[in-house]
Design a protein with these regions (language model features):
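N-terminal secretory/membrane-targeting segments
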Residues: 1-79, 96, 111-114, 119
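Solvent-exposed soluble domains appended to multi-pass membrane proteins
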Residues: 54-244
Length: 244
């Protein structure tokens, strides 16, 4: 029986998993992370632009803290919060970007009727970069690959931890070890992981169970909730390859 990609992720160490996938390629790629560089002069030169974009009041000293007070009493009602990350949903192709083709009218309607975070973005492609940006509120600017695979970038703050008294759930149809999603998710305290193989739900491709089954699973759990909950549902059905 030929080995499948997920067979490489049975190890406890992510390095061994990536080594098993493609030893030579991953060995060469990992060399780029031996000495991560930080160019302070370049950072200081670009700081005024970043400071203006982030609306920082103090611009003389180079600091990256931004404090925003509560703007409504919505959280005081302790609502259930569900974030649904749609795989390969390109912003520039959507109606929200002003695309004249009006490709996503229903999602555009949701963005206008709800809260649209227009400054939450990842600087380039990759599901891992999007996950990092959404959880931390910081764009993944890792030059090589992405921050989820850089041990020095994994320890991040997330606003989700300030939801006191909430159950916290993460749903993925496949394995969260892929691209070390799990490393980023470990920043969420008390997070319950619903990933990997399900005994009663067959996988449909290399990414695991279907998005429909994933959403049904989440809905079933939500109906049993005894208190407020936060959930992050990450779809994968729009990601190649689509076959097993």
């Amino acid at each position: 029986v030929p080995l499948k990609r997920r067979d490489s992720f049975r190890f406890q160490q992510s390095f061994l998993s990536y080594l098993a996938i493609n030893p030579l390629q991953n060995f060469a790629a990992t060399l780029s992370l031996r000495q991560p560089s930080y160019n302070e002069d370049r950072a200081r030169a670009l700081y005024p632009i970043l400071s203006n974009w982030m609306e920082w009041s103090e611009t003389e000293q180079m600091q990256f803290r931004r404090t925003i007070g509560p703007r409504s009493t919505a959280v005081e009602s302790r609502p259930n919060i569900v974030i649904l990350q749609c795989e390969s949903f390109s912003m520039y192709k959507s109606s929200m970007s002003g695309n004249p083709l009006n490709t996503t009218p229903f999602v555009d309607s949701l963005s206008r009727k709800g809260i649209f975070f227009e400054r939450c973005f990842a600087p380039t492609f990759s599901t891992a970069r999007a996950l990092f940006a959404i959880l931390t509120g910081v764009p993944d600017a890792q030059l090589f690959k992405f921050s989820s695979r850089n041990p020095k970038a994994l320890n991040q703050y997330t606003l989700i931890n300030s939801l006191e008294g909430y159950e916290k759930h993460y749903f993925l149809g496949g394995d969260a070890e892929f691209n070390n999603f799990e490393g980023v998710l470990q920043n969420v305290e008390g997070l319950q992981m619903h990933t990997g193989q399900r005994p009663s739900i067959p996988p449909i491709n290399v990414w695991g169970i279907s998005d429909k089954d994933l959403l049904h699973e989440a809905h079933t759990l939500f109906n049993r909730a005894k208190g407020p909950f936060f959930a992050y549902i990450q779809t994968a059905g729009n990601h190649r390859p689509f076959q097993r």
